[in-house]
């Protein structure tokens, strides 16, 4: 099963990715992990990526795509994979189609975890972190027993500056604009599957499981 996982910040992608790879024993391939592994192994593309990163420059598409090609050609991807964080653009998605064709494979589903942006705003702005021990809470979904006080160490809880409403709203807006062309691209190819991410996390996974179970 060859899957791509999509969703806006706060949609719960990480939780669902963990459950998918645990049940189906396929590698969870995130862009960051791919780059780190390629640079550590000193592959041709990894060394090229390192030369850009060391200069503080953006890694060009052809290098990123080369790293994806190297990674998807590895033995642990024979039974499938879960791509997370790639592709980000229609150009990258088109390049991925070519890679899959060359490998004699195809993308089975693009799973888009759908959550209303108002609910995402609530999820993302409700996070609170302990100044002392770093424990994470949520005002609505995982509140501390006593307001603004850490259950574990009694430290003071604070909101990160990038979790404030204006910053989060801007981040969501940028993400929505960036991902729409990609969602349209995959809808046209017939790969796109919309998953209701507003349910309980176990129900979200149950819906994904029903969809992808037949691919195993």
Swiss-Prot record:
- Nucleus as a keyword of this entry, yes or no, is no
Superkingdom of the source?
Bacteria
Among CDD domains, the record links this protein to: ADK (cd01428)
Q: Where is this protein chiefly located?
A: cytoplasm
The reaction(s) catalysed by this protein are:
AMP + ATP = 2 ADP
Q: Which InterPro entries match?
A: Adenyl_kin_sub (IPR006259), Adenylat/UMP-CMP_kin (IPR000850), Adenylat_kinase_CS (IPR033690), Adenylate_kinase_lid-dom (IPR007862), P-loop_NTPase (IPR027417)
Gene Ontology MF: a single term: zinc ion binding
- Subcellular compartments: Cytoplasm
Q: Tell me which Gene Ontology terms the entry assigns under biological process.
A: AMP salvage
The residues that the entry says bind Zn(2+) are: 130, 133, 150, 153
Pathway(s) it belongs to? Purine metabolism; AMP biosynthesis via salvage pathway; AMP from ADP: step 1/1
**Region NMP, residue ranges:** 30-59
The entry marks the following residues as binding ATP, namely 10-15, 127, 136-137, 199
List cellular component terms (GO): cytoplasm
Region of interest (LID), ranges: 126-163
E.C. number, please? 2.7.4.3
Amino-acid positions noted as binding AMP in the UniProt annotation, renumbered to this chain? 31, 36, 57-59, 85-88, 92, 160, 171
Q: Which UniProt keywords apply?
A: ATP-binding, Cytoplasm, Kinase, Metal-binding, Nucleotide biosynthesis, Nucleotide-binding, Transferase, Zinc
- Catalytic class of the enzyme: transferase
**Subunit (UniProt):** Monomer.
Q: What's this protein's function?
A: Catalyzes the reversible transfer of the terminal phosphate group between ATP and AMP. Plays an important role in cellular energy homeostasis and in adenine nucleotide metabolism.
Family named by the database record = Belongs to the adenylate kinase family.
Q: What is known of its domains?
A: Consists of three domains, a large central CORE domain and two small peripheral domains, NMPbind and LID, which undergo movements during catalysis. The LID domain closes over the site of phosphoryl transfer upon ATP binding. Assembling and dissambling the active center during each catalytic cycle provides an effective means to prevent ATP hydrolysis. Some bacteria have evolved a zinc-coordinating structure that stabilizes the LID domain.
Quote the protein name from its UniProt record.
Answer: Adenylate kinase
Native source species: Bacillus cereus (strain AH187)
* Top-level taxonomy: Bacteria, Bacillati, Bacillota, Bacilli, Bacillales
Supply the gene name: adk
């Amino acid at each position: 099963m060859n899957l791509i996982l999509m969703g806006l910040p706060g949609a719960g992608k990480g939780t669902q990715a963990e459950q998918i790879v645990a049940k189906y024993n396929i590698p969870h391939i995130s862009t960051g992990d791919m780059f780190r592994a390629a640079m550590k192994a000193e592959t041709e593309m990894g060394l090229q990526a390192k030369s850009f990163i060391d200069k503080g420059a953006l890694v060009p598409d052809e290098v990123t795509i080369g790293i994806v090609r190297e990674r998807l050609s590895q033995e642990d991807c024979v039974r499938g994979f879960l791509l997370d964080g790639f592709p980000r653009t229609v150009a990258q998605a088109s390049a991925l189609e070519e890679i899959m064709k060359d490998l004699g494979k195809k993308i089975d589903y693009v799973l888009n975890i759908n959550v209303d942006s108002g609910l995402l705003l609530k999820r993302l702005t409700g996070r609170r972190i302990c100044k002392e021990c770093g424990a994470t809470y949520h005002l609505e979904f995982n509140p501390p027993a006593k307001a603004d006080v850490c259950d574990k160490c009694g430290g003071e809880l604070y909101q990160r500056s990038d979790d404030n409403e204006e910053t989060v709203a801007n981040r969501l807006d940028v993400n929505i604009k960036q991902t729409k062309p990609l969602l349209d691209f995959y809808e046209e190819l017939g790969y796109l599957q919309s998953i209701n991410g507003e349910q309980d996390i176990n129900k979200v996974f149950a819906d994904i499981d029903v969809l992808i179970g037949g691919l195993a």
